[in-house]
Regions:
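Sec-dependent N-terminal signal peptides
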Residues: 4-13
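Boundary regions of SH3-family modules and the immediately adjacent low-complexity/disordered segments
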Residues: 20-23, 68-105, 111, 140-164
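Sec/Tat signal peptide C-region and signal peptidase I cleavage site
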Residues: 14-18
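Short N-terminal segments immediately surrounding and downstream of signal-peptide cleavage
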Residues: 19-37
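Short alpha-helix capping/helix-loop boundary micro-motifs
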Residues: 38-45, 110-116
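Short, solvent-exposed interaction modules
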Residues: 94-133, 138
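SH3/SH3-like beta-barrel superfamily modules
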Residues: 46-85, 121-153
Length: 164
């Protein structure tokens, strides 16, 4: 029984680590730091201050509209581990579309690249990340009020530099 539990733990750990991503913390509220919660919608356990400069967070899981993060860094600091992992709402997390070739890039209705395909010509814009899987990101682009899946090759998660 212990071996089975250990194997399940190892399999779950591998899956979780394989799905980890880095997102940019871009909180529009510049009056106070961003809340990190013990559970989605729960008590605030710590804050991350990204008012002076953007920060990146290391995401290890997703639950509903929240991402579970375990560390963060800013342009002027190395990675800092949180005392305990905590949840941040998707509305303050995202990524840049870095379509520097300025081509009409394909976007999809699902992460398996099936469903209606559309081509959008957008570049150097911040989008909120709603989900991620199969090297695809489900994003919300506020300016167009559109949600779509996009391949990671069109995205940049660098808060302090540009991506090529």
């Amino acid at each position: 029984m212990k071996k089975i539990l250990f194997l399940l733990f190892v399999l779950f750990s591998v899956k979780t680590n394989a799905q980890s991503i880095t997102l940019i913390l871009n909180d529009p509220d510049k009056q106070s730091p961003t809340n990190v919660r013990v559970k989605p919608g729960g008590e605030v356990v710590t804050t991350i201050d990204s008012r002076a400069e953007l920060a990146t967070v290391h995401v290890i899981a997703k639950e509903g509209n929240y991402f579970l993060v375990n560390s963060y860094s800013t342009c002027s600091s190395d990675e800092m581990q949180l005392k305990q992992p905590g949840y941040i709402h998707y509305s303050v997390l995202g990524i840049f579309i870095s379509n520097y070739a300025n081509i009409a890039m394909p976007v999809y209705a699902s992460s398996n690249k099936s469903g209606p395909l559309e081509k959008l010509k957008i570049s150097d814009v911040f989008v909120n990340v709603l989900d991620y899987k199969n090297d695809m990101y489900y994003v919300f682009y506020k300016k167009l009020n559109k949600k779509f899946w996009v391949e990671s090759k069109y995205l940049c998660n660098a808060a302090c530099t540009t991506c090529n």
